[in-house]
């Protein structure tokens, strides 16, 4: 019974190493216990990282991307302080699948980066991160990895007590305030109920200096760089003027006849020491130019840039990220029946969020004035408002004396409205009707063979409204069948997996949808894709002290609806976004080699990976701009991604002064264009722009009786591998982030436990700008924050 319950707990239980592989774990006698840390599961068929609730207490932030950015190989997309998606090995959005208890959530970050992932972090119990392709398990949208987030809406095992309550109160100097509670109890012998709610609000986010990068005001950089002007959201009054200091002489003839012959400065300044007088047919000396500076190039230096003024779209205030407000709340209720071999549960969750993006746009592009005075352009702040309803169902059954070990069924229905606002005006809104279901069948172990086979069905209806709608109404259907088999020969283990997916994309344009003048999705053709996913890996265990492994993945991804059908001004990214309904599926072949050692209390691991993409889909510059919008098109070319990751840690039991763990890491990723395309080299360069930079970091955690401490220091290096935005990409300065958490547990009340804690974020108060953030010129990371809170468990 105990094994059955544990099997049913995980949202992705078929991939749990202790069950899928039935591995024998022999604990070392001198291993220090009671310190929970992020552990790379070397004996898993996938390169996974498991993050416990205890670890989340230290690293949890406002967004999922910022929370997971403390993990090697993962960074934050950083679309302002209130929106951030995980970036795994330079990939995010439509290439990183986010799941809740094994079922896909409503994630629109791949369609528009200002949307947040629909996850309530206070209800997360555990996160499993797949840093390599997980497409066999979860389909093509996991071509770059996946996150499986375990929440507590549905109870899967009977609680120890008939009534349990958890509460949280927290306030911070630069993180606002939040409250949360959850409760569960036993209704009858086998029935359990759950209920919970949370609330969060913050007025503004403070920073150590100015919100915009100082280079936004450098006339030598922004004077004639329209793309950088757009990224900085500035108006520049600039012009090209004749370089008078280039010419050694002034034409006397031009001075005498300037008005008569309607001459210009180009005629006035000359390289000739004499001029011809047609009145008498003689040559006379020209006067010298007092402004003349010798040594200049007659062609390159003929004209010079003159910047007369730089003005922000909207004036910013020092020490504050503009439009950085946020508020959110959620509520859930659920019930479960838990029997000896069967459990069935259902839950409902409602969530609301409203937050600002540190950028501005205009509701309507001004028309040409035809010589009349141009009216003043009024820019409005970009805000995001989301309302989501989720219905969840989960059931599992454990067999005995039967070829099938267990069967599990998950369903999630999502009904949401996700609006992009200009101030309070609804510019664009997506109404989502999404249904996902997943069936997993795990077979009984046959000597050295275990495995799981499953079926997954997904449906999404996305309807758009608003004056700045940039996508037609779309419908997506996906169905996939997969199997993952594990062969265990003790010191050598193998994994083999295959998945077949069928994907449909449909666009339904109506009369209210006005397309741009660009490609704008072509003919909005119906598209059908057949995808094949394959995984294989081998692992050699070395004297129970370490391992060597190699894995190969073949993954395929169907283009998303925005890549196929977008066709209008997407104000949130200040781009006229043009999809291409002719795009082919994306194909990736990945090889990863890794190894690790576990010597008593010392652990070290490292891995190298290389992914070759065919038809890598990216949003490319065209070199054209219309009004304030850059014109971009979704294109595909061959790309290569490679990188390394390394970790090490040491645990020590120091007796009276506690149990401690010290660790360190390093990561590097490069996203390289290998296509023989002169257009891509011209527009985007040799490397993909906005690529995550390399990092290294150190951590210390431990506990002394009821006290615990966590410290982390992460250093982000200056990017060496730069792409282009037509013009060469600018690197962000290197920076370091120091975070600390101190906590004390008090169980003297007799009815439960209290935990008092203090958290310090960015304690160095560093101006930190993420190289991979699209808003890096507008917004740094938040400045120093000190939070204090209390948790109660009854």
Give a label for each model feature.
Residues 175-201, 212-354, 387-398, 483:
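Transmembrane beta-barrel wall of Gram-negative outer-membrane proteins
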Residues 104-133:
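Short acidic/polar hinge/loop motifs at secondary-structure boundaries
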Residues 378-400, 522-541, 545-547, 554-613, ...:
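Outer-membrane beta-barrel signature, preferentially recognizing the C-terminal barrel domain
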Residues 208, 556-557, 612-615, 717-722, ...:
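C-terminal beta-signal and adjacent terminal beta-strands/loops
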Residues 32-67, 85, 93:
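N-terminal periplasmic "start-of-domain" segments of outer-membrane beta-barrel proteins
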Residues 24, 321-328, 343-407, 412-436, ...:
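Flexible loop and strand-edge segments within Gram-negative outer membrane beta-barrel domains
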Residues 603, 608-613, 630-723:
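Gram-negative outer-membrane beta-barrel transporters
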Residues 26, 64-67, 84-87, 99, ...:
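N-terminal periplasmic accessory domains that precede
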């Amino acid at each position: 019974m105990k094994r059955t319950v544990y099997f049913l707990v995980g949202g992705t239980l078929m991939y749990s190493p202790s069950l899928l592989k039935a591995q024998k774990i022999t604990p070392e006698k001198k291993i220090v216990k009671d310190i929970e840390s992020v552990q790379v599961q070397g004996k898993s068929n996938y390169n996974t990282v498991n993050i416990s609730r205890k670890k989340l207490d230290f690293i949890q932030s406002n967004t999922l991307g910022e929370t997971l950015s403390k993990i090697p190989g993962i960074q934050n997309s950083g679309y302002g302080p209130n929106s951030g998606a995980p970036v795994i090995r330079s990939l995010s959005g439509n290439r990183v699948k986010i799941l809740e208890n094994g079922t896909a959530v409503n994630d629109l970050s791949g369609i528009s980066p200002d949307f947040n992932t629909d996850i309530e972090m206070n209800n997360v119990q555990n996160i499993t991160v797949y840093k390599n392709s997980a497409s066999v398990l979860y389909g093509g949208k996991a071509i770059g990895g996946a996150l499986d987030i375990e929440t507590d809406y549905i109870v899967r095992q009977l609680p120890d007590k008939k009534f349990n309550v958890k509460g949280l109160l927290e306030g911070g100097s630069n993180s606002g305030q939040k409250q949360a509670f959850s409760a569960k109890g036993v209704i009858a012998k086998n029935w359990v109920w759950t209920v919970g709610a949370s609330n969060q609000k913050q007025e503004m986010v403070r920073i150590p200096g100015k919100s915009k990068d100082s280079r936004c005001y450098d006339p030598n950089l922004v004077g004639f760089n329209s793309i950088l002007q757009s990224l900085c959201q500035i108006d520049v009054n600039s012009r090209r003027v004749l370089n008078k200091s280039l010419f050694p002489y002034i034409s006397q003839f031009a001075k005498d006849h300037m008005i008569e012959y309607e001459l210009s400065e180009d005629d006035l300044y000359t390289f000739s020491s004499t001029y011809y007088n047609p009145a008498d047919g003689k040559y006379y000396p020209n006067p010298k130019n007092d402004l003349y500076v010798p040594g200049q190039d007659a062609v390159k230096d003929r004209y010079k840039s003159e910047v007369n003024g730089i003005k922000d779209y909207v004036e910013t205030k020092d020490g504050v990220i503009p439009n950085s407000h946020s508020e959110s709340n959620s509520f859930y209720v659920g019930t479960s029946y838990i029997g000896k071999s069967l459990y069935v549960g259902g839950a409902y969750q409602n969530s609301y969020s409203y937050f600002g993006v540190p950028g501005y746009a205009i509701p309507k592009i001004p028309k040409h004035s035809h010589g009349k005075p141009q009216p003043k352009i009024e820019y409005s702040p970009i805000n995001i408002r989301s309302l989501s309803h989720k219905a969840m169902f989960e059931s599992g059954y454990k067999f005995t004396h039967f070829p099938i070990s267990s069967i599990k069924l998950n369903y999630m229905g999502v009904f949401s409205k996700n609006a992009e606002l200009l101030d309070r005006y609804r510019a664009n809104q997506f109404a989502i009707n999404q249904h996902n279901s997943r069936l997993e069948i795990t077979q009984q172990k046959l000597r050295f063979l275990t495995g799981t086979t499953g079926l997954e069905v997904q449906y999404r209806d996305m309807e758009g409204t608003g004056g700045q709608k940039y996508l037609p109404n779309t419908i997506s259907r996906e169905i996939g069948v997969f199997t993952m088999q594990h062969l265990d020969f003790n010191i050598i283990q193998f994994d083999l997996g295959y998945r077949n997916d069928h994907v449909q994309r449909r666009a339904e344009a109506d009369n209210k949808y006005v397309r741009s003048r660009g490609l704008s999705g072509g003919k909005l053709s119906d598209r059908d894709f057949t995808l094949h996913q394959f995984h294989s890996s081998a692992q050699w265990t070395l004297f129970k002290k370490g391992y060597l492994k190699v894995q190969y993945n073949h993954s395929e991804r169907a283009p998303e609806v925005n890549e196929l059908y977008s066709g209008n001004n997407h104000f949130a990214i200040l781009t006229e976004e043009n999809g291409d309904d002719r795009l082919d599926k994306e194909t990736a072949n990945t090889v990863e080699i890794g190894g690790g050692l576990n010597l008593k209390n010392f652990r070290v691991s490292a891995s190298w990976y290389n992914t070759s993409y065919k038809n890598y889909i990216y949003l490319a510059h065209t070199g054209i701009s219309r009004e304030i919008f850059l014109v971009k098109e979704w294109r595909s070319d061959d790309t290569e991604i490679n990188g390394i990751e390394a970790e090490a840690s040491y645990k020590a039991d120091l007796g009276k002064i506690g149990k401690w763990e010290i660790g360190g890491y390093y990561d590097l990723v490069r996203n390289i264009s290998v296509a023989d395309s002169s257009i891509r080299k011209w527009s985007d360069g040799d490397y993909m722009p906005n690529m995550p930079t390399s990092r290294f970091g150190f951590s210390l955690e431990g506990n002394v009786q009821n006290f615990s401490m966590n410290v982390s220091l992460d250093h982000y290096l200056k990017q060496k591998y730069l792409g282009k935005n037509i013009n060469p990409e600018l690197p962000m300065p290197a920076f370091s982030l120091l975070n600390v958490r101190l906590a004390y547990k008090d169980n003297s009340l007799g009815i439960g436990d209290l935990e008092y804690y203090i958290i310090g974020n960015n304690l160095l108060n560093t101006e930190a700008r993420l190289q991979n953030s699209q808003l890096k010129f507008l917004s740094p990371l938040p400045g120093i924050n000190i939070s204090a809170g209390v948790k109660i468990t009854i």
